[in-house]
């Protein structure tokens, strides 16, 4: 029986947990498994819309800086006495505007999304540092003093499940619905597979990036809100370490770096796989630097595997040719 990739990822996730559990039995504790997701679930929150961007043939590497900018902006608004019921929607709006700005630059300049979002990565990161400096929040302290009702949010539970995990499940369902069960998703895959054919089919090839990058921006703002609530402080560097794991989750989940294919469920499972990998390595005493290096190595291996699978015929001919030459 041939397993699909999502099933394979689920099996790998279970094996990963069992492996780390054999080394450290705490890894098998159900409460630890559930509540430790709050440490890394933001990887999945931003990886889901990033998957859609990759399916379309684009990329967004500015999401980490967008998270930092949204986080510090939330802190500044709180410092100026703005109530949280206004500051939270404004933070979401800021994330949306960052995403739309990326899309507008890509649309009107025609420059590669990689180059554009590399530029905005530094633009948003610089803006976050500027706001942080103006607010007097330098170093690792950030801006604290958030209302208890806000900081308690990330520690609430619904049916015994932590709120961040429930939020991730809801966001996953939303993206699965629009990507795999609607006209939006069909248009998305067609644009990623063949933009020229999509234009001939009268699809909104130029309009699609605004929706996709806007979703990444909003998801980045949501991640910022969750992280600020969880850590109790707003810092400009909150999203610094999320880009590589999020990109790894999207590609490991099945997103084709050349566009045209991908899976929301695959990305969700891959995000848990990457997150529990980080948690497991920390629990067995592996430094964070090694964990980051392994995430990068995993991304390289997955990209190489995807590239080889796309050029399967060339690889087969290459080995056939060299095998004959050795005889």
Swiss-Prot record:
Domain of life: Bacteria
One example GO MF annotation: transmembrane transporter activity
Transmembrane annotation, as ranges: 3-23, 41-61, 63-83, 86-106, 114-134, 158-178, 211-231, 257-277, 283-303
Subcellular locations according to the entry: Cell inner membrane
Record-level GO cellular component terms: plasma membrane
Keywords: Cell inner membrane, Cell membrane, Membrane, Transmembrane, Transmembrane helix, Transport
Quaternary data: The complex is composed of two ATP-binding proteins (LsrA), two transmembrane proteins (LsrC and LsrD) and a solute-binding protein (LsrB).
Xref: PANTHER family: ABC TRANSPORTER PERMEASE PROTEIN YPHD-RELATED-RELATED (PTHR32196), AUTOINDUCER 2 IMPORT SYSTEM PERMEASE PROTEIN LSRD (PTHR32196:SF71)
Family recorded in the similarity comment: Belongs to the binding-protein-dependent transport system permease family. AraH/RbsC subfamily.
Protein task: Part of the ABC transporter complex LsrABCD involved in autoinducer 2 (AI-2) import. Probably responsible for the translocation of the substrate across the membrane.
Identification of the protein by name: Autoinducer 2 import system permease protein LsrD
Source organism: Enterobacter sp. (strain 638)
Gene: lsrD
